Amino acid sequence: PCHNPTGYSMSMEEWQEIVAFLNECGKEVPVVLLNDIAYIDFSYDLEHCRNYIKTFNDFSENVMAVIAFSCSKALTSYGLRCGAAILLAQTKEAVRDVEIVFEKAARATWSNVPNAAMENFTYVTTTNYDAYMKEKAMYVELLKKRSDIFTEEADACGLDYYPYKEGFFVTVRIEDNALRDVFHESLMKQHIYTVKVNKGIRVAVCSLSSEKCRGLAKRMKEILDTCK
């Protein structure tokens, strides 16, 4: 959900297709699905955005899901690195086997996560939960307003972008990476700062004011046209 860099979120039907496909693969080899939910707490439909996880109940015994959760993203505390790997499988034995490996690998690689990050997450999910959810709802609405401005204006001026549903980022579609590089340089010369991704330019609407979102798509389209 809220995919980085496109802002795409898959439907329940798409997840069901993936589960069926992975079960077929599981007939030949063990399969592990890594589901990155770093930005899920900024979904525009927070009440239902986790419903798709129920489809994981249909995984065969040869398929496991690892859900990667980021406290750093959920709490917008990027400097306090903290997260979790949630293991889901049909047998307790399979979960425990992977849990042991994760425990040893994580401990050997990073030791413990910062105490401040753990303390902050505990505080926000208990004592300060209601205040956190209220504040976050305000930011989700602000994010939706910004993304609506950019995508609606992109549609109006013909600036192509990858399918977007929700989240921090919108990615402009540039199939030719050589053109993308020229476009990226031209944007910077006009003080428009984006991130290059494969066959695209990522726009972080999360870091732009609504005012700066207005007219941005049109400016980018005009600059792109001069690069062709």
Each language-model region and where it sits:
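Short hydrophobic/aromatic beta-strand micro-patches
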Residues: 86, 171-173, 204-206
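Active-site phosphate-binding strand-loop segment of PLP-dependent enzymes
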Residues: 1-48
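Conserved glycine-rich beta-strand-loop-beta hairpin in the small C-terminal domain of fold type I
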Residues: 122, 135-155, 160-173, 196-199
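Well-ordered, non-membrane alpha-helical segments in soluble/globular domains
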Residues: 12-21, 47-56, 144-148, 217-218
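Conserved core segment of the aminotransferase class I/II
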Residues: 57-140
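Short helix-capping segments at alpha-helix termini
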Residues: 25-28, 58-61, 157
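Structural preference for beta-strand elements that scaffold enzyme active sites
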Residues: 30-32, 66, 169, 200-202
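PLP-dependent enzyme catalytic core of the Aspartate aminotransferase-like
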Residues: 19, 177-228
